[in-house]
Amino acid sequence: MSSNVISLFPAKQVVNRSRLVLLPVIGLLIFLAMWHLAAREVQTSLGTLPGPVQTFQQFSNLVDDHWQEREKEQAFIERQEKRNAAKLTKNPDAAVKIRPYTGKPTFFDQIITSLVTVTAGFLLATVIAIPLGIVLGLNQGLYQAFNPIIQLLKPVSPLAWLPIVTMVVSATYVSDDPMFAKSFINSLITVALCSLWPTLINTAVGVTSVDKDLINVSKVLQLSWWQHIRTIVLPSAIPMIFTGLRLSLGIAWMVLIAAEMLAQNPGLGKFVWDEFQNGSSASLGRIMVAVITIGFIGLLLDRGMLQLQKWLSWNKQQALR
């Protein structure tokens, strides 16, 4: 009897693993079928709404455009090297100029730009939110004083922040040879302003929720302020902090696309806006490619943060959510 029960476990594991694979695949197929059927019924000023097949074709075209642009870049570099070599042959002391390639960014270049921008904005938000959240969590008076301000600023849209950020950056970030483009700085700061609140709030709540027994142990051991933070507060608050970080990263990615549309930072948001303004027959398909890419990258960012939470958090159950 026991041997029969034991023999069932491998079969049960196979069934469970099959469900993990098959159910998402079935859901994806249903989604594609519904998209295909619905797209044929929607007529726009640019034609029929693109379905999965047309969207994939536009993705293939974007891949081809990327490689064509890389070939142009390589040809430009080779011509420049030949020209400089010929110039140095005639005059070894001649000054040669190395000009960067200034071709248009491809779809994949814009993906990289968006990833760099959202990473910088998210890191800035994290650097501000976690220390401030710890301070507010440790001091109930400060938390009560600043909580109304936090609740006031938390729901402000990036479309409201961006004009203010743009004016401030234009007035303060003045340089003849800037290290970063103003559009990048505008997008970065807007992302940080909109995404820091979940991490700030969850960090403060996590700190205030530290077990009283652990706080008493810290007092008995006469730990210094920094030792108390490092050995008691942070380990206890880690699950809540990571919950805030996951929420902040999702908001950062969502906000970035809107910010790039207005700030004209050459990322995915600008790609969508340019295609919308272009209004060609291929524009709708390319916008659909961008929409799916934005969603897919957002999913990867969330899964990556979830995996990091599993590695660093002691609360494995919360890391599964």
Range-by-range predicted roles:
Residues 198-244:
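Short cytoplasmic-facing helical segments at TM-TM junctions of multi-pass membrane proteins
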Residues 56, 100, 104, 108, ...:
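Alpha-helical membrane-protein architecture signal
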Residues 41-122:
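Periplasmic/extracellular loop-to-transmembrane helix junction in inner-membrane transport proteins
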Residues 120-150:
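Transmembrane-helix boundary motif in ABC transporter permease subunits
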Residues 7-41:
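N-terminal signal-anchor/first transmembrane alpha helix
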Residues 137, 147, 151-198, 205-206:
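Generic hydrophobic transmembrane alpha-helix motif, especially the helices
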Residues 225-259, 289, 305:
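Transmembrane alpha-helices
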Residues 288-321:
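C-terminal transmembrane helix and the adjacent membrane-cytosol boundary/short C-terminal tail
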